[in-house]
Amino acid sequence: MAEGIGTFGTLSRDVLEERLMEARRTYRLNMGYAGLKQLPPGFVELVKKYNPHITELELSSNDLTDLPDELEEFRYLRILRLKYNQLKRIPAVVYRLPQLMVFDASGNRIQKVDDAIGHLSLLKELDVSGNEITTLPESLSTLPKLEVLQVENNRLELLPESLGELPGVIKMDLSTNNLRYLPASMGQLKKVQRIDVGNNLLTKVPPSMGHLKTLKEFNLRYNHLDDRYKAKVEEGLSKFLAFLREEEERERLEEIERLKPIGTPVGAYLEYRCKAEVGQVVKTDMGETTVDNRCWIRTGHTLTQVGSMLLIFGGQLQKDGSTTNDLFWMTMDRMEWHNQPCKGEKPPPRYNHAACYDEENNRLVVFGGRTAERKRLNDIYFLDLDSWTWFKPSTEGTAPTPREQAVATFWAGSMVLFGGHAIGGRTNDLFLLDLGAWQWSQPAFSGTAPSPRQACALCIGHGNLLFVHGGRNNFVLEDLHVMDFVSKNWTEIPCEGRVPPPRHSHRITVHRDQLYLLGGLDELGAQSVAMYRVALPAGQQDTYATSKPKWVEWDSELPYNKNRTATLWNGTISIYQLGSNTLGRVNDDDAEKGLDELRPKNAKRMRVQHTINTAGKMPRSFTQHSAHEARVLQYVQDFQRIFEELYPYRRPLYLTPRNECGVPKFVCTSLRPSQLVYTELYDLDGASQFVADFLSYEPLEDPLHPPDTLPSPMSALEWRAGDSFDMATVLASMLLGVGYNAFVVLGYAPGPVVQNDQRNTDLAATRTGAGAEEEEESGPCKFVHAWVMVLPGKREVTEAMFIEPSAGRKDVSYDLSDPTKWEPVFEDRGMRSRADGNADESETEGGGGLDDGEGVEAEVVPDIPPSWVPKLTIPRDAFDMRCPRHEIFARFGDCSRWDGMVERLVLYADEERTVVTEIRETFTRRRDKLRERRVYPQKDTTIEHFNRGSVFALKDILTVKNDRRGRKVIQYYTGRDDRLIYISATYAVDPLAPRPQPSALLEEYSSLLVAEKDCLQWVRDGEWEISEIIRTRTNQEQNITLETPYYDIVRIKAEESEEVREKALKALKDRLIERANIIQARLDEESAALAKRQQTFHRDRDQMSAAEEEDYERQTEESMFRIHILERRLRRHEEQALHKYYELDAKLRADGRLAALLN
């Protein structure tokens, strides 16, 4: 029957027939050692003729590179062995064998196990040892039946964190790999008996593995374990597991202590800043969800303390008035809020409800309240705090009527519910709910019960006593009652001393025979911050009516806070409030103190005074004059003196103001032409808008006169503030640097312009009548202002324009004939020229520059010296943070975000910022080595850039969504002289060529088949690689992990500290080896040159002159000397290298940042 198959590797037909007959009897087909490179066509059909239900297939010791898809027709195959083949990946058909229980692919060249391995739900044994695997998929942990996992002799560096979730694994062999640590989840292996992780790079073992009760053998030989682990391993398995449990407890306590916040003492209290992460990704049974952990300020909620944990449920949010059913929790160890996603039947949103903690079953029980539609409730829900699951139990008995602001507490396995505002009014009934049988009951009580009330305070004391205080009905109450659950009798307690004023919504608790009272609202709704206590009688309840305990008021040391919630538990007060006076919020009571010191101060004068005090830190040109500057200043002063003599009633010229160091400078030298690196500042509009946005406008201290101080544009950019003169100086310097013909001009401006007030701009232009007459009578405005004037002739400027620096606008009138806006500096009559005036006076004044230009000697007027201001620069972060050109830029701290983002820039296409064109995100400390991501929403394109060391050695990834490319290429043309529109090329047989022989056609056909197969394989490999990249990137983005910086001594762990030490030592070792190689290379080069010179000498010695022989001897001597020096240097380097290595190791171990974790 094997005749139709032809040759079958190295197996003869008789042997094949024998093995097929054996498969018919034993359901096991052995095709090992057959020399197969692939299973031939028809193999599956041939085997099915003999036995279609084979359960074991042996294909070991062949040259197989893949398996055909037809193999999945063996539906009953349970054992598949592919040892010692040439597989580079597990064939895809293997994952489609539903009954497979044993799979052996050891001794191949497999580099990766696909996620599809999770489809083999019946797999019991998996052997992929002796391959080139570097990682294992997370889906491996979903195999419910897996008992044996053998991955030894591979290149594993990481194990999936969920590996310990394998429920039935018994044997696990991970030896001879490159593992540096084991996942902590391996401590969850419930049935494991043998674990082999020998011959790896492990330095420690997860302490959670100390709980492996079934473990019988644990091989840790040939690793890099520290001394403590080595010593415990040698003592035996039981003692080593006990050591791991001790390590786990120690690390847990250290982690709690490390993450514990540090409080600020405020009297007897400690104040903490509560933290909350926005956008945290939380894993649930339904998948991953993103939660907002900010616990917004609310009212009508419940705050319940469970040990060191605080639970907040429900309430009305003050930010928007919405009603919520969210559950938040926080521990005293971390002071960090968490919005807990819960399962089960969640209660509807509510407020003014009651809640208590079930101590026996670890549950939070919630009753009643009001919905968002103001409907009162009387339902019961409880939350299992172990599984975070809500339940709505079915209760029996007569339940309380729907109500709000009832109070509840826990006693003897029951919830005690008292009072509240029901539909018919306030109540004073008391209910008990058995939390085991969920049975409502209302016992009969005697004595003087409290009057109906709501929002009172309730607590349990002395075992069986229930205390009730205050609350409100039509009035706010102050009475105190006690009820004994044994005698079922109510008693009102008459008190003396400083009795707390009437209040409601407060808290009471019993601690060490003292009843404490805190907080509440008084009759006017004002918050009370006082705290009271009263000593309780030591006898039975009967003594309460006659003992008259005395109230004592304590100084609570709590300032006022408009929103505060508190709990009293186990002698500790826990208060959650809005803001803190101690931790940064300004106390309003101090706002009226020191009014004399709060008078407005000129910010510029204060900055200048500070610069004068620290002038020694400024550049030398700021505090001194060069010789050239001194000559120009003398010339300018002479000119200014003559001008004042000629025009005594004119405003003095603004020529030599003082700089920020108090040194007079010529005003023209204060401009510093500078071309910055930012392209947005190369044009007029961009530079003008930048100055208006970047610098904060400050009015002049004296708006009627120019400022006494004109700081350099460098200081104005550092201060990021200034008046019109400072802003104009900065803008003119930038425009000059990019080629504009810019000047700073001085003039008068209306009050709204000087004050940068645009509220009445339109109204001022429409005023007529009396208002206009009053303005004319008051004369023209004399408020001083500065602009930037840009003249035509450069940078394609066609007409002159004036720029308002504080707004970046160009709407200033250039009509010089308008006398209301322009005033001539020199009158029409001019001034005396040198030819008409007194020559002696002119000579005395040094020319003064006041003549008409006739007979002037050019050398008399000095040239303007270079600017005393350094070249302007703007830091990148300062430039980016101003949000120019429809951009929003955000920068984050290195450790502030969970995803490692440090910069985010969003570009918009419109001024309203509604159309996003590009999003640039920069990351750091990412384990996936992601450096930058650019998203173009309009093009559905994403570009990601990676650092070295990324998976698949990725450098860049370009992802384009919804991009379909056709299979036919047509070239289209337009505007051609030959009228060509498009070209579409096809190929056919050349009719003029000689007809090929059949053998040639067969050979070509065979080669094309092989080429087609190779091409298809390349395509499949490419598709597989692309899919793996996409899957890996998806997993990385869903499980982002960050590398802890070595300088973060708070968060860095021991293994990370060890890694820092190893990197430092490796860097030193590489540098020492590199230096040794350099010395050796130079030594080899000198030795080769000497040998070549000696060979040449011996060959040409007879023809060499005496001078040449002397030169040879001199060069040989120099070479020998250099070789000797290099040999000595190499020996000394080898001797010192080891010493330097141990010296650095000792320094690292003694370093304070690493010693606590390494030693």
Curated annotation (Swiss-Prot):
| Start-end of each LRR repeat | 21-46, 51-74, 75-97, 99-120, 121-143, 144-166, 168-189, 190-212, 214-235
Respond yes or no to whether keyword Ribosomal protein is given for this record.
no
Question: Mind telling me which SMART domains this protein's record contains?
Answer: LRR_BAC, LRR_TYP
Q: GO cellular-component terms in the record? A: axoneme; motile cilium
Residues in Kelch repeats? 309-360, 363-413, 415-463, 465-513, 515-571
Q: Which InterPro entries match?
A: DRC7/lobo, DRC7_C, Kelch-typ_b-propeller, Leu-rich_rpt, Leu-rich_rpt_typical-subtyp, LRR_dom_sf, MORN_DRC7, Papain-like_cys_pep_sf
- Main location per the UniProt record: other
Pfam families found in the cross-reference section: DRC7_C (PF24671), Kelch_KLHDC2_KLHL20_DRC7 (PF24681), LRR_6 (PF13516), LRR_8 (PF13855), MORN_DRC7 (PF24667)
Where in the cell? Cell projection, Cilium, Flagellum; Cytoplasm, Cytoskeleton, Cilium axoneme; Cytoplasm, Cytoskeleton, Flagellum axoneme
Locate the compositionally biased regions of type Basic and acidic residues. 827-837
Modification after translation:
Phosphorylated.
Instruction: Provide the function of this protein.
Output: Component of the nexin-dynein regulatory complex (N-DRC) a key regulator of ciliary/flagellar motility which maintains the alignment and integrity of the distal axoneme and regulates microtubule sliding in motile axonemes. Involved in the regulation of flagellar motility.
The record's similarity note reads: Belongs to the DRC7 family.
What's the protein name?
Dynein regulatory complex subunit 7
Print the organism lineage: Eukaryota, Viridiplantae, Chlorophyta, core chlorophytes, Chlorophyceae
* Primary gene name: DRC7
